[in-house]
């Protein structure tokens, strides 16, 4: 095995050292690493994946058998897929895809910035609320002081005017009622008294005049005879 390794890697003395020193992970992990590193849209072929693993790791004589077995297990577990059939390219499914450590760090950095920006936003409304609290009692006190003198000034004259008006109106009404009642009583008395006096006198005057006029006529007739 020693001469074959040296003959197949002439001019690559450094890589031979890495192959012997690097530990060999599971074949399934080797396939996933190869597909992620190659980063092909439709997946990577078996030959490309095997070449990537052989160039990076020192594999044994049973590499092909272990490789095929790992692919079969990955397909059954739903981690790998072959869209073009058993002889086609190998592709990773979303479940098996793992983000690189560099991409995870980049995704974590914007999250920290968002948290820092949110802190001053929360503090601003608290400051505004504190500044607004002392202003409310001052306005309420000013409004109360302005209302009290106005209410006192208006209350006194209104009470006096109302009392005088009521008294004047009551006196005027009472005076009118007394005048009307006295005038009405006088008219009624006059009407009742007049017809009694005139009704008895008129017929007596007429009878006396007739009697007086008849007497001289009889005397004149006697003289003429």
Curated annotation (Swiss-Prot):
Family the entry assigns: Belongs to the histone H1/H5 family.
Subcellular location: Nucleus; Chromosome
Family matches, as InterPro entries: H1/H5, Histone_H1/H5_H15, WH-like_DNA-bd_sf, WH_DNA-bd_sf
UniProt record, GO biological process: chromosome condensation; negative regulation of DNA recombination; nucleosome assembly
UniProt KW Iron keyword: no
Organism of this sequence: Eremothecium gossypii (strain ATCC 10895 / CBS 109.51 / FGSC 9923 / NRRL Y-1056) (Yeast)
Ranges for domain H15: 23-94
Stated role: Could act as an H1-type linker histone.
Family annotation (Pfam families): Linker_histone
UniProt-annotated stretches for the region Disordered: 1-20, 95-147
Keyword DNA-binding: yes
UniProt-listed PROSITE patterns: H15 (PS51504)
Keywords, sorted A to Z: Chromosome, DNA-binding, Nucleus
GO CC list: nucleosome; nucleus
Gene3D superfamilies: Winged helix-like DNA-binding domain superfamily/Winged helix DNA-binding domain
GO MF term set: double-stranded DNA binding; nucleosomal DNA binding; structural constituent of chromatin
Lineage of the species this protein comes from: Eukaryota, Fungi, Dikarya, Ascomycota, Saccharomycotina
Listed PANTHER family: HISTONE 24-RELATED (PTHR11467:SF36), HISTONE H1 (PTHR11467)
Protein name (Swiss-Prot/TrEMBL): Histone H1
Amino acid composition bias (Low complexity), ranges on this chain: 128-147
Record's compositionally biased regions (Basic residues): 107-127
Superkingdom as given in the UniProt entry: Eukaryota
């Amino acid at each position: 095995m020693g001469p074959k390794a040296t003959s197949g890697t002439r001019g690559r003395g450094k890589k031979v050292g890495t192959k012997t020193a690097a530990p060999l992970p599971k074949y399934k992990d080797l396939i996933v690493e190869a597909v992620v590193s190659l980063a092909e849209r439709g997946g990577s072929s078996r030959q490309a994946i095997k070449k990537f693993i052989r160039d990076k790791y020192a594999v044994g004589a049973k590499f092909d058998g272990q490789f095929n077995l790992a692919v079969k297990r990955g397909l059954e577990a739903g981690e790998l897929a072959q869209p073009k059939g058993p002889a086609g390219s190998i592709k990773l499914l979303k479940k098996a895809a793992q983000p690189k450590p560099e991409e995870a760090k980049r995704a974590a950095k914007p999250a920290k910035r968002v948290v820092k920006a949110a802190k001053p936003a929360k503090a601003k409304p608290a400051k505004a609320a504190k500044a607004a609290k002392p202003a409310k009692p001052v306005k309420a006190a000013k409004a109360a002081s302005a209302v009290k003198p106005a209410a006192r000034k208006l209350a006194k004259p209104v009470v006096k005017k109302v009392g005088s008006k009521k008294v004047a109106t009551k006196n005027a009404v009472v005076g009118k009622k007394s005048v009307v009642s006295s005038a009405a009583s006088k008219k009624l008395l006059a009407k009742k008294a007049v017809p009694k006096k005139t009704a008895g006198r008129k017929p007596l005057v007429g009878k006396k005049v007739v009697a007086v006029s008849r007497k001289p006529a009889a005397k004149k007739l006697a003289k003429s005879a």
